Amino acid sequence: MTIFGSNIVSTHVDLTTALTRDLLLHQAMLRLAAEPNALFLGQNVQYDGNVMFKHLDGIPVSQRLELPVAEEMQMGMSIGLALQGFLPINIYPRLDFLMLAMNQLVNHLDKLVLMSKGEFNPKVIIRTKVGSTRPLNAGPQHTQDHFEALRLMLESVRGLKITSPS
């Protein structure tokens, strides 16, 4: 499982850095989409509604599954899809929303290898954004940065790899 977070806290990012980061994130999503079993799921994966939507440009709609705001269900669905051979790429528009899926992440996905005696080792990719105030300020609920605290907690989760582009 990989958590791929965009840690963008500063509101003062120069244009070249922002464009380079956007290009890299878009290319990463296209690379994942090249996998025949890849499925992107979450809020605003089929309809523009957040800044992460633009990184899905060029990915076929048939590889996107639009979901309601139900973060724990989304993670649970991803685990089930992974067990069926899919490569689920979860899109959580904000880190705050990922925290609502922690039950599935640490109590189910983390333990499936042990519970199945090694028969199942589901792969799930999670994409989220941390503390962004651009292109719009989302207010006090969605601009805090708990990434470091979450990273420290998730270091104990087996098979988890956390990446964060600078």
Which ranges hold each PLM region?
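Thiamine diphosphate
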Residues: 1-166
